[in-house]
């Protein structure tokens, strides 16, 4: 799920009940680019600024990619809508991580 994708891109493990906005760059140009964990009341604004780029695309959760032009702004904020999920297991988040990732997950449980 989203935890695995974020980790594969160098992002953190975030406990599901934490109400945060998480932005993890995928294949960033700079090795100093890290994940951003923001409180849910913040709005993140990303603006395309380099006129020399021919193609800039935005893809969210693997959905259809949208082409962006120079100066376009994308605002990301917490939705006012809430989705209820069905929990099929009585295992805790850390137990599920441990079953999928083994010892690596135990480092984050403590």
Q: At which residue positions do the language-model features occur?
A:
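Catalytic phosphate-donor-binding core of small-molecule kinases
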Residues: 4-110
């Amino acid at each position: 799920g989203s935890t695995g994708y974020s980790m594969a891109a160098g992002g953190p493990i975030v406990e599901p009940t934490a109400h945060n906005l998480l932005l993890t760059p995928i294949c960033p140009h700079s090795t100093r680019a890290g994940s951003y964990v923001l409180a849910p009341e913040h709005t993140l604004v990303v603006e395309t600024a380099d006129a020399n780029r021919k193609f800039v695309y935005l893809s969210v959760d693997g959905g259809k990619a949208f082409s962006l032009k120079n100066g376009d702004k994308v605002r990301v904020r917490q939705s006012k809508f809430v989705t209820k999920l069905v929990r099929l297991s009585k295992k805790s988040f850390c137990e599920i991580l441990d079953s999928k990732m083994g010892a690596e997950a135990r480092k984050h449980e403590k």
